[in-house]
Structures are given as C-alpha cells and as structure tokens.
Swiss-Prot record:
Membrane-spanning residues: 63-83, 96-116, 122-142, 164-184, 202-222, 241-261, 355-375, 405-425, 453-473, 486-506, 516-536, 565-585
GO terms assigned for molecular function: transmembrane transporter activity
Pfam families named in the record: MFS_1
UniProt-listed SUPFAM superfamilies: MFS general substrate transporter
Role summary: Probable transporter.
Compartment list: Vacuole membrane
Gene giving rise to this polypeptide: mch1
Keywords: Glycoprotein, Membrane, Transmembrane, Transmembrane helix, Transport, Vacuole
Lipid bilayer topology: Multi-pass membrane protein
Protein name: Probable transporter mch1
Record: glycosylation sites: 57, 325
Length: 598
C-alpha cells in the first residue's frame, strides 16, 4: 500500500489543490485539539486551584444575587387587576401586557444566549441593568399619568392619547422582559459552566433557577407589606404601583451592574480544550460531516465560521509556530478565540440537527405555556371566585398569597429535583456532548432517569390545572392553594429539569445558546394560552353584561364559566407534551436507542 502523500505547505498550494484531503482532515482535527504551544501557554498560565475556587464562589454568589432579583415579572398578577380598576384596561389589554413581557422574556433568548457564550455573562448582565431601568421607569411614568388622569375623569385626555399610553406601557413591559431574560441567562450560564461538569451539576443549576422562582415570592411580600397605599384614616390600601415600579427599576439596575463585574467563567480555555478532546475521542472530529460541513467552500459552516484548512493555517492554527508580525500573546488570544468559536458553532449545528431536540423543545413549549398563563392571571382568576352578590366569611384570599405559594413550591421542588437527580439519575462518563453511547455506567443499586422526574412533575402541573377547571375551587377561595401549589411544583420542576437535561445530553460549553433555543418556545405558548384565557374571560364579561349583570363592574367576570374551558385545554396541552418527551426518550432513534445516558 502506498504511503500517504504529505500535506503541502502553504507556499506549495495552488488554486487547483483540493482544500480538504484526508491528511488535512486529520491535521485539522489534531490541530484544533492541541493548538500546540498556544495550548501549553494557556495551561501554564491557568489559575491556581485555590484562586479558581475563590473565583467560582464569587461568581456563584453574584449569580445567586442576580437570580434572587431577576424574577420581578412573575409578580405581574399583583398589579394586573389594578390596571383594570385604575386604568380601565380590558382583560385583553391586561393580557396584552403580560404576553408582551412573556414574549420578550423568551424570544430573544437564543440571541442573548449566543452573546453570553461568545462574550461572557458580564456584558449580558449590564444589558439587563439598562433594560430594567428603562422598562420600570417608563412603566412607572405611564401608570402615574394614566391613573391620575382617570381619577380626575379626564380619560387619559382622549382616545388617541390613551392608545399611545398603552403602546408605551407595552414597550415598557417588553424592556422588562428582555431585562429578565438577560439577567436570568447570565446567572444560569455562569453556574452551568463553572459547576456543571461535576457530579452535582443538577444542584448547581437548580440553585440559581430556584432563586429565580424565589424572587417572585419575596418581591410580592415586600410589595404587599411595604409598598401599599396609605389612606388618611390610616387604613391600608392596594399595592402602590408607581413607587413599587421605581423601587424595582433602581434595585435591578444596581444588581445588573454588580453582575457585570461578578459573573465570570473560570478556566474557560480548559473547558473548550476538554470539549475538543471529547469530540475527538468520540470520532466526531474525524467525520466528514463535521469538518467538511464547516470548511468546504460549497457548504459553509454554521454561524460566522467558514474556514478552510488553508485559512486555518494562515491564521496560525495548523502551524502555531509560524512567525507572525503580531506578538505571541496576540497570536495566542486569536488562536484561543478561533478555537472557541469553532467548537461552539459546531456544537450549535449538531444541536439543531438532532431531531430529538425538536420533540423535546415542543414538549417544553406545551408544558410551560399553560403554567405561565396560570401565573400571569392569578389575580383575575381569584376575583372570579368571589361573586359580589354572595356573602363570604372572612377575608378573601389574595394574589400576593398565591404568588408566594407558587414561589415557595417552585423553589422547593427545583432544589429537590436538582438534588435527587444528582443522587438517583444515571451519570454519563462524558462531561460534554454525548454523541454516541457512553459505554459502561457506574453501577448503582437504583437509578431513575431525569426524564422520569420531568414526566412526573408535568403530570403534577396538569392535575393543578384540571383541579381549577373542574369548578371544585369556585366560591371556595380557601381551596385555591391546591391549584397554585400543584402548578407551582410542576412549573418549577419542568423549568429546572429541562436545562439540566440539556447539559447532560448536549454539554455545557454551548449551554447558553442551546438552552436559549429551547427556552424561546414557551413565549409562543404563554402568549397563546393567555389569549385563550382572555377570550374565555371576556366572553363571560359580555354574557354577564347582556344579562344585565355588568354595570359598574363590567370589566370583570364571576364564576367558573370565566376560566373552566381554558384550563381544561391547558391540562390537555400538558398531556400531549408528555407524549412528545416520551417519544424523544424511548421512540425511534431516541436517546434510549442511541445509548445516551439521561
């Protein structure tokens, strides 16, 4: 057998030389893996273990602070009904605000996740500070002007002015949604990359995600106990929306600025190097799909990378010892940056071409949308439980109470699922993307897949929705805790387990981008189910008005007909989602058939 022809030097390559020969393919793979002296310099200059541990702990504290404050949008139900009462918004208009915020919270996630993976979580935290300050500042100003005008009977100075004011309020909640997305993503990505490669990856992700759920609880309690209206006779009124918005704007701006400096990825070069080694051990780097898909001229690579072996050699990657006019440190930084981009873009393309990801993402969409709609409309749902023509003993239950119940159950279940999956779920030998079977697993007396946990809590979520839809809670507001507790537990577990499963199957190097793509889907679900609920609710309002029961309260609906059909449909949506996730796991060419440990 003839010996292989050695790869030509750059000065020997003519226009007719093929850009991707077998030798250059293996050369590319080995060069991307090692980057020769550049990689050695990175390893020699790496942070000491003690300093790295301190940096990780500081970043974790900063991520925890960001997560504890970022979930302000989850308490929308505390003031949604006030918009109806003071600003005379219809249920459709109130849901328009919550849907705009939900849409803005989820839709930019792929772009912001891509930015987080490429430039780091710090700049993303600063982006969140700017959006939160602008959003809550604008919302406070619009609310103050409209509420004062309505109190004086000016009707917001005319219909056109009212439309402009509503458009400004929509813009404010879009800003708040983008700020929420940015702060949450920067915090979770920091924890995923700093701690997500160890055996406690579930807890490392569950803690900031749980803290995000907890943020709604403490903010709702602070609002109801501190930021309330005080009347001249000393009695306590409803939430003081204007001052509460000002407080949230200032708080979140400060927290976002602190995260700009506190959120860091420690030893990221090692993370990328290990990812490349894992890809090569799996044989993925030697496959034509990976290299040719990225480097051939007729099939450009995913994203901004479109490099041939000649381009890579010219850039100093295939031959890092090649002299260059730039300093060694600049060459080293360039090589590290190109290698990082190469790996991240490759993993993004692999993620997008995995059919099980789309089943999983669609299932997440059908689970989270109903949960979001329930949480956003807590305030108006609770009001339907207390028809004004009936006398009730004691104080009616409040939206703040059930926002706190959702927050507490969500937080506890997120921590519980993170801990239990670390203890009971099987662990792959690979710490990065699982491309083929992980081989022999560590023997355990008992193991339970993370997907089993996900399906169990999804069913729990659907039971909470069905309980409300059944009418069992109508005229019995004291029972509402059953629905809010079950929905909070299911919603929290699904939101915690989904990113954990993503890190286990597709690795942590490209986590922000991968999670961002999946997290985009609930925006459509929350918007859709919010509109369904609004349509059912508004139908009840119009029916009551036609029967002569509207009067001064003509924007409100009372009775199970205001919500029952909407929440039955939401429960069915969650059941369909369970089927999709089960198919991705156990179906044809699913994770189980491919030997992927999850």
């Amino acid at each position: 057998m003839a010996s292989p022809t050695p790869a030509p030097r750059p000065d020997q390559i003519s226009a007719s030389t093929p850009l991707l020969q077998s030798d250059s393919t293996s050369s590319c793979a080995s060069s991307i893996r090692s980057l020769s002296p550049s990689r050695r310099r990175h390893r020699n200059g790496r942070t000491s273990p003690a300093a790295a541990a301190s940096a990780r702990n500081l970043s974790f504290a900063s991520a925890l602070l960001s997560s504890l404050c970022a979930g302000s949008i989850t308490i929308f139900s505390m003031y949604g009904h006030i918009f109806q009462e003071r600003l005379h918004y219809t249920q459709f208009e109130v849901n328009g605000l919550s849907s705009a915020a939900s849409f803005a919270t989820y839709m930019p996630v792929p772009l912001l996740g891509y930015m987080c993976d490429r430039v780091g979580p710090g700049p993303l935290s600063f982006v969140s500070a700017l959006f939160f300050a602008a959003g809550y500042g604008l919302a406070a100003g619009v609310y103050k002007r409209e509420a004062d005008g309505a109190a004086l009977g000016n009707g917001a100075d005319g219909e056109d002015t009212g439309r402009l004011a509503y458009a400004a309020m929509i813009t404010a909640f879009v800003f708040i949604g983008v700020g929420t997305c940015s702060m949450y993503m920067s915090a979770v990505a920091t924890c995923a990359k700093n701690f997500g490669r160890g055996k406690h990856r579930g807890l490392a992700l569950a803690v900031p995600i749980a803290a995000f759920g907890l943020s709604g609880m403490w903010q709702s309690q602070l609002g109801s106990r501190v930021f309330y209206e005080r009347f001249a006779d000393g009695t306590k009124g409803d939430l003081d929306v204007f001052h509460f918005f000002i407080f949230l704007g200032v708080l979140l701006f400060v927290v976002g600025c602190l995260g700009t400096f506190g959120l860091k990825i420690v030893d990221e070069e090692d993370l990328i190097d290990e990812a490349v080694e894992e890809l090569e051990r799996s044989g993925y780097l030697d496959g034509s799909t990976f290299l040719q898909g990225s480097w051939t001229a007729d099939r450009p690579g995913y994203g901004a990378i479109e490099q041939s072996p000649l381009d890579m050699e010219s850039a100093g990657i295939l031959d890092p010892s090649k002299p260059d006019n730039d300093s060694d440190s600049e060459e080293e930084d360039d090589n590290a940056r190109i290698k990082k981009t190469w790996v991240l873009n490759a993993e993004t393309r692999r993620f997008l071409t995995d059919h099980t990801m789309w089943c999983f993402a669609l299932g997440f969409f059908l689970m989270i949308g109903p949960g979001e709609a329930f949480i956003n409309n807590l305030g108006t749902v609770i009001k339907t439980l207390y028809p004004p023509h009936l006398k009730f003993v004691g104080e009616p239950t409040s939206a703040a109470t059930h926002v706190s119940i959702v927050g507490i159950t969500s937080t506890l279940v997120r921590l519980l699922t993170g801990s239990l999956t670390d203890l009971l779920a099987p662990s792959p030998q690979a710490r990065h993307v699982q491309i083929t079977s992980s081989g022999t697993l560590e023997r355990k007396r008992f193991s339970l897949s993370r997907v089993s946990f996900l399906l169990f809590f999804a069913v729990t979520l659907s039971v909470g929705l069905a309980t409300l839809a059944s009418g069992w809670i109508q005229n019995h507001g004291e029972r509402f805790w059953v629905a809010s507790g079950l929905v909070g537990a299911g919603y929290g577990a699904v939101f915690s387990l989904t990113p954990i499963i993503i890190t286990v199957i597709w690795g942590v190097e490209n986590f922000a981008t991968n999670w961002g793509i999946v997290a985009m889907f609930p925006a459509l679900g929350a918007t859709f189910w919010g509109l369904v609920y609004s349509a059912v609710y508004q139908s009840g309002v119009e029916k009551a008005a036609s029967n002569g029961q509207g009067g001064e309260e003509d924007q409100f609906c009372y009775g199970s007909e205001c919500y029952a059909s909407a929440f039955w449909a939401m429960a069915a949506s969650v059941w369909v989602a369970c089927g999709l996730v089960l198919w991705a796991w156990k179906g044809k060419n699913g994770w189980a058939q491919r030997g992927i440990v999850v």
